[in-house]
């Protein structure tokens, strides 16, 4: 049979997806984290893989789903949080713009799965299934109550789940995980479609969302999930030493306040007394597209006058950041290769060919 007749849509998908194959899985497994450091990789949206000097591996908010894929239904889902926020009826054109850089079914070495909250782009049934099927049978699933309810509903045993709320501390090998207050007001209006938010006092944030501080032997990482800007960041900065802080950044559409702006990201870094602040989430949704260079430009304008003690870092999905080795870098670039050029004799018609 000819190739053009044997190839199907299914064979095409299996041969190209996930786009990075197991490349990043292998890179993470092979990484030897030096003493006094920690390494992390951006998995897209707010997904992070963190690896300590002791070889402890945890993932946070690793999501393997998609956004809109069809114009079929022109209307937003009734009762959606964005509909509640802005009184809209039209479908939100949020298409996923980031490739899948990590294969969940190629994960073998992992010590904990975490989620900050239960929004679809922060917790994933495929990740849960892959870990349950292919990894050690004692890997815990850690998150606020709403996340644990989801995991249990998907079939993760209750005894594998750990509910956390602000103030709780969970030890995973050489990483100490502190659950802290979250400031995700959008989470408070994520309700059943038939439940009204107008005129009703929201229930507590603590069951719905948490921020995390990861204390490793080589430094600390603050993961803010989908939190908006809050004055309370300063309290977290007073109470904890924070080396690297991650904040959800995006260009909010008209009538919407769901992501931090460039000014908010700088205020967050200052309030937390962080050394490095890194925006994320701006990569994933087409309708929240934002240029992180805006953060750096604003930082340059303000840093001397306001005596900032932190630097911004502009990352790329799938890229690695190592603390403290990368603390003075401003931007990430994927490895360019060709570092071994001219280690063998070139095969050219003549030397001046190039």
Swiss-Prot record:
Reaction equations catalysed: L-ascorbate 6-phosphate + H2O = 3-dehydro-L-gulonate 6-phosphate
SUPFAM superfamilies: Metallo-hydrolase/oxidoreductase
Cofactor: a divalent metal cation
Any Pfam family hit: Lactamase_B_2
EC number: 3.1.1.-
Subcellular location: Cytoplasm
Hydrolase keyword on record: yes
Keywords: Cytoplasm, Hydrolase
Gene3D superfamilies assigned: Ribonuclease Z/Hydroxyacylglutathione hydrolase-like (3.60.15.10)
Domain of life: Bacteria
Biological process according to GO: L-ascorbic acid catabolic process
Keyword Hydrolase assigned: yes
GO molecular function, one term: manganese ion binding
Main subcellular location of this protein, as a coarse class: cytoplasm
GO cellular component: cytoplasm
Signal sequence interval, chain numbering: none
Root EC class: hydrolase
Induction behaviour: Induced by L-ascorbate. Repressed by UlaR.
Record InterPro entries: L-ascorbate_6P_UlaG, Metallo-B-lactamas, RibonucZ/Hydroxyglut_hydro, UlaG-like_MBL-fold, UPF0173_UPF0282_UlaG_hydrolase
Pathway(s) per entry: Cofactor degradation; L-ascorbate degradation; D-xylulose 5-phosphate from L-ascorbate: step 1/4
Family as reported in the entry's similarity comment: Belongs to the UlaG family.
Job description of the protein: Probably catalyzes the hydrolysis of L-ascorbate-6-P into 3-keto-L-gulonate-6-P. Is essential for L-ascorbate utilization under anaerobic conditions.
Matching NCBIfam families: PRK11709.1 (NF008688)
Designated name of the protein: Probable L-ascorbate-6-phosphate lactonase UlaG
Species the sequence originates in: Escherichia coli (strain SMS-3-5 / SECEC)
Lineage of the organism: Bacteria, Pseudomonadati, Pseudomonadota, Gammaproteobacteria, Enterobacterales
Gene: ulaG
């Amino acid at each position: 049979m000819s190739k053009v007749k044997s190839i199907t849509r299914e064979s095409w998908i299996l041969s190209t997806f996930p786009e990075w194959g197991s490349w990043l899985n292998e890179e993470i497994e092979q990484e030897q984290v030096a003493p006094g450091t920690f390494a992390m990789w951006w998995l897209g949206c707010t997904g992070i893989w963190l690896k300590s000097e002791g070889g402890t591996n945890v993932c946070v908010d690793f999501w393997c789903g998609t956004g809109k894929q069809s114009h079929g239904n022109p209307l937003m889902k009734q009762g959606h949080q964005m509909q509640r926020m802005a009184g809209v009826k039209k479908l939100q054109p949020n298409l996923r713009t980031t490739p899948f850089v990590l294969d969940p079914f190629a994960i073998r070495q992992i010590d904990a799965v975490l989620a900050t909250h239960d929004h679809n782009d922060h917790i994933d049934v495929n990740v849960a299934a892959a870990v349950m099927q292919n990894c050690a049978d004692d890997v815990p699933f850690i998150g606020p109550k709403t996340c644990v309810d989801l995991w249990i509903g998907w079939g993760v045993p209750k005894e594998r789940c750990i509910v956390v709320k602000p103030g709780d501390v969970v030890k995973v090998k050489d990483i100490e995980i502190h659950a802290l207050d979250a400031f995700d007001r959008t989470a408070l209006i994520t309700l059943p479609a038939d439940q009204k938010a107008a005129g009703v006092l929201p229930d507590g944030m603590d069951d719905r969302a948490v921020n995390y501080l990861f204390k490793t032997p080589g430094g600390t990482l603050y993961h803010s999930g989908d939190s908006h800007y809050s004055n309370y960041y300063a309290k977290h900065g007073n109470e904890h030493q924070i080396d690297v802080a991650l904040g959800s950044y995006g260009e909010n559409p008209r009538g919407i306040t769901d992501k931090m702006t460039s000014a908010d990201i700088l205020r967050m870094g200052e309030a937390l007394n962080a050394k490095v602040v890194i925006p994320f989430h701006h990569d994933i949704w087409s309708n929240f597209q934002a240029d992180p260079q805006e953060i750096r430009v604003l930082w340059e304008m303000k840093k001397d006058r306001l005596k900032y003690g932190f630097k911004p870092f502009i990352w790329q999905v799938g890229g690695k950041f190592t603390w403290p080795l990368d603390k003075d870098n401003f931007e990430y670039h994927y490895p360019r290769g060709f570092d071994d050029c001219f280690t063998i004799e070139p095969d050219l018609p003549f030397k001046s060919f190039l």
